[in-house]
């Protein structure tokens, strides 16, 4: 029998006026083994997923999949107006202080704005403490897994100005993890592995053919996603970063 291929998963906040956020809930979400997709939405959520290659968004966002293969194409956190299209002023967003825990596996976690606690076990994990996206290449590796192209933080609002980042606590297990904590006073602990840790904003790009890490940079982007804003607008963080054994790259910001 044929199996349907998922095209996209998107959170939508609809209001009568089309421009303001609805009241949100503090959700408790638990899943078992398997490759899960979870969008917590706004509010103080508690999300626990077991082993598997999971995708978790602590607040609002979208996940799209490649049309033919069904592999992951893009994962992004975003705060949308009632029409579901353009970002609104971040002052209107009731963000959540989320608690996110996962089992072993290659997880992607975009915690979103707020003071989040993220705990991830062993695996080649990608964790963004605040806003950002993971863009995949249009190819798979030898195991049939989607290959990353870019992982980046981004701060979006209607006025191209910075959003206050959260004071996040991020802990990962053994494995080659990628962590972009984002703005705010963050506490980051990674275990053994060839880890990449950015204490504030930045991006990592990957080689097209091999999928190996190509470029790592710390930067602060406007809401177009490419031009650097004046540093006086950035509310940077006093971060605490601890790593285990391995060939780590750390840019504290």
Each predicted region: which residue ranges?
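Surface-exposed or flexible loop/turn and strand-edge residues in extracellular/cell-surface modules
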Residues: 24-26, 35, 44, 95-97, ...
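Extracellular repeat-rich scaffold modules on cell surfaces
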Residues: 102, 172, 243-246, 250-252
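Acidic/polar low-complexity surface segments
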Residues: 1-28, 32-33, 50-99, 121-169, ...
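Periodic glycine anchor positions in long extracellular repeat architectures
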Residues: 34, 40-43, 58-61, 105, ...
